[in-house]
């Protein structure tokens, strides 16, 4: 009795050599240069610098304008408006500081903050209109900013504006 081998038979064709994939080593990409704002002659900085400074000044002035409005609200729904405006203006100095400090850090320059008189708000409709104007100003600035962290901080200001507007329009 003959024993059959259970071994596999070798293929008679020649063995093919496998080619290894070519590996290419690349140098790490250089970090892109920091975007440079457009020059603005006569201001001592760029137009972006000027707009960020103007936004910060507007936030600081809005604090005073809304504080005064907060103190003169009377009539039906005045308590809800009083509280809503109080919550809003309390946060504005922090938002202004965050904007200026963050921008000065990323741009590595000190902004010039000009003195501008605060706006006078006579009633709630003036306050709501001012909130809408501030929102539009911030939206425009965000569209010009190359720094995502500053854009995100400005989103928080817009969130505070939206919350105040909601409370003033719908909570009585």
Identify what each model region corresponds to.
Residues 41-62, 123-127:
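Disorder-to-helix initiation segments
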Residues 62-87, 142-147:
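Helix-loop segments that flank and shape redox-cofactor active sites
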């Amino acid at each position: 009795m003959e024993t059959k081998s259970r071994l596999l038979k070798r293929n008679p064709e020649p063995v093919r050599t496998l080619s290894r994939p070519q590996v290419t080593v690349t140098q790490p990409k250089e970090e892109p240069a920091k975007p440079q704002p457009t020059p603005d002659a006569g201001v001592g900085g760029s137009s972006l610098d000027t707009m960020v400074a103007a936004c910060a000044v507007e936030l600081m002035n809005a604090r005073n304008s809304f504080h005064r409005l907060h103190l003169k609200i009377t009539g039906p729904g005045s308590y809800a408006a009083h509280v809503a405006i109080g919550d809003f203006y309390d946060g504005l100095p922090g938002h202004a500081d965050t904007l200026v400090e963050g921008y000065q850090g990323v741009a590595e320059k000190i902004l010039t903050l000009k003195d501008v008189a605060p706006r006078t708000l006579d009633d709630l409709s003036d306050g709501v209109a001012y909130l809408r104007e501030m929102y539009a100003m911030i939206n425009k600035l965000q569209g010009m900013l190359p720094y995502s962290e500053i854009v995100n901080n400005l989103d928080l200001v817009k969130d505070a504006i939206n919350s105040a507007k909601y409370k003033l329009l719908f909570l009585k």
